[in-house]
Amino acid sequence: MMMDHENEQRADVMQPIEELRYLILAAQREGNRLFAEALRPLRLTPSQAEVLRVLQDHEPLSLIALGDLLVCETGSPSRLVQGLVEDGLVERIPSSTDKRMVTLTLTNLGREMAANVGALESQFYEANAGVVKDAPLAEILEFLWRFVEGKPAGIALARRMGRETERETLAL
C-alpha cells in the first residue's frame, strides 16, 4: 500500500524538463505509429518512406550522402537500402572509378512509390494540422531546433532542408 502512495508522490514531482522529454518521446512515438498505419497499404515502414522521399528530392546519392540526410538512421543505411533494392524501388549503380562506391537512384517503381508516400504525407499533415492550429508554431519550431542543435538528427535535417547548420534554420 505504501508503494502506491510513493508512486502518486513521484508523479507529482516530475520536473518540467522531464515532462517535456517524455512528451516529445510520446509525440514522436504516436506520430510514427500513426504514420506507420497510413503507410501499411504501401507495405513500407516510416524509415523506408523517408529513404524514398530523400532520394526523390536529392537523387542520385551515394550511400554515405543518403545517410547524412536521414533522420531515421544515425549509422549507415545499408540494410535499409538493401530491402528497398530487393523490392525493386531503389537501384544501386556501381561507381566506374571506385568499386566500393555506389550511387543510389529510384527505379520507376520507386518514383511511383515515393509519389504515393508524398501524397500520404500531405494527407497525414492535413489530418493532424488541427492539433497545432492555435499553437505558436514558430516558437515551438525554434525550441525544437535548439533541442536538436549539434545532434546527428538535427544536423541531418538541416542538411536536408538545404541549410548548413541548425542556426541558419533558427534565423528564418
Question: What is the predicted role of each segment?
Answer:
Residues 1-12, 134-172:
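C-terminal regulatory/oligomerization modules of transcriptional regulators
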Residues 1-42, 89, 169-172:
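N-terminal leader segment of winged-helix/HTH proteins
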Residues 21, 25, 29, 71, ...:
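Short amphipathic alpha-helical segments with heptad-repeat character
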Residues 25, 29-74, 87:
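N-terminal helix-turn-helix DNA-binding core of bacterial DNA-binding proteins
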Residues 32, 82-142:
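Charged, amphipathic alpha-helical coiled-coil/dimerization segments
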Residues 63-64, 75, 82, 102:
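Residues within helix-turn-helix
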